UniProtKB/Swiss-Prot annotation:
Belongs to the MRG family. SUPFAM superfamilies: Chromo domain-like (SSF54160). Residues 138-312 form the MRG domain. This is Chromatin modification-related protein eaf3. PANTHER family: MORTALITY FACTOR 4-LIKE PROTEIN, MSL COMPLEX SUBUNIT 3. The lineage of its organism: Eukaryota, Fungi, Dikarya, Ascomycota, Pezizomycotina. GO terms for molecular function: histone reader activity; methylated histone binding. It comes from Emericella nidulans (strain FGSC A4 / ATCC 38163 / CBS 112.46 / NRRL 194 / M139) (Aspergillus nidulans). One of its GO terms (biological process) is transcription elongation by RNA polymerase II. Component of the NuA4 histone acetyltransferase complex. Signal peptide: none annotated.
Length: 327
């Protein structure tokens, strides 16, 4: 954040500005303090969106603006494409629903990791479950950018584990901790002030926390649980402070981002905070996509017959939704 009395953006500067969930090219026409009597109050900016009528000119707070950099322009393009794809998907689902089809879908492979087995209960309990589910689906969707090459890697990962009975060689060549540290090292210098750096570090800390809590509950396929059981036993017996963040890598981290929209949807964050988190997470997935050759495993290990037999006896965790199993 700029020091009191200074501004991060200038009049006539070319910028990118958020309007709802999309970044648009804009120009700053004017700026002023939010409190005319307080020279230390934050600035707000009058922006004109390129190609829009003047009636859309608007005073916006600084947190809706982004510098007109190549990286932010790429993010703007990606966000627009994601929004267009979501709109087409929504249109297709609406059409299917009118024809009697289901409007709920799940990512490939998620069923094996997250399938819930409903038990018997009273009608009131079942009604409450239905009410909770309906409430979940009425919440605003949180779309995180998932580049095509990451989607392909997730599909390959699913096939390697569930069909080919292979596991990722662990420890990964780059652990989750190492990947996030590399991202911080590269991203910090690009942030314009201390508040931007604080947001970045807070988001990365949250990713670490989510991964640590969710790995054994929602990110592992059944076939991988024997591998995790052996690793966990080793962590508990060793004095070295090691854990999932030090051993697992890009494959399982990307699985986390595939489930992140559901996790975020079940939080109580306001719209502004949700949009900012979505932006930060999308920046990371774009960065990981560009560096995928460096971080993702080049080979999987074919499991032995002994491992296959043992994997059949390792139970799944308690069933439930992704977030309920994080508790």
């Amino acid at each position: 954040m700029a020091p009191a009395g200074q501004t991060t953006y200038q009049k006539d500067e070319r910028v990118l500005c958020f309007h709802h969930e999309i970044l648009y090219e804009a120009k700053i026409l004017d700026l002023r303090h939010t409190d005319p009597d307080d020279r230390k109050s934050p600035y707000e900016y009058l922006v004109h969106y390129k190609g829009w009528k003047n009636t859309w000119d608007d005073w916006v707070p600084q947190d809706r603006l982004r510098k007109f950099t190549e990286e932010n322009r790429e993010l703007a393009t990606t966000l627009r494409r994601e929004a267009e794809a979501a709109l087409r998907q929504k249109s297709t689902k609406t059409s299917l629903k009118k024809k009697g089809g289901s409007d709920h879908s799940s990512a490939r492979g998620s069923e094996e990791r997250q399938t819930s087995v409903p038990g018997r209960g009273t009608k009131r309990a079942r009604d409450n479950d239905i009410e909770k589910e309906e409430h979940f689906y009425t919440r605003p969707s949180v779309r995180i950018v998932m580049p095509d090459n990451l989607k392909s890697l997730l599909v390959d990962d699913w096939e390697n584990v569930t069909k080919n009975q292979q596991v990722v060689a662990l420890p990964a060549k780059s652990s989750v901790n190492q990947i996030l540290d590399d991202y911080l090292k590269e991203e910090r210098p690009k942030r314009t002030g201390s508040s931007e750096v604080d947001v970045l570090e807070e988001v990365v800390m949250g990713i670490r926390d989510y991964f640590d809590k969710s790995l054994d509950k929602i990110l592992l396929y059944r076939f991988e649980r024997e591998q995790y059981r052996v690793l966990r036993k080793r962590w508990e017996s060793e004095t070295a402070d090691k854990g999932p963040l030090d051993v697992y890598g890009a494959e399982h981290l990307t699985r986390l981002f595939a489930t992140m929209p559901e996790l975020i949807a079940q939080t109580n964050m306001d719209l502004q905070s949700t949009n900012r988190l979505r932006e930060e997470l999308s920046k990371f997935t774009i960065w990981l996509s560009k560096n995928s050759n460096h971080y993702f495993a080049t080979r999987y290990v074919t499991a032995s017959n002994e491992y296959i037999e043992k994997s059949r006896g390792v139970p799944n965790p308690a069933p439930g939704t992704a977030t309920s199993r994080l508790v």
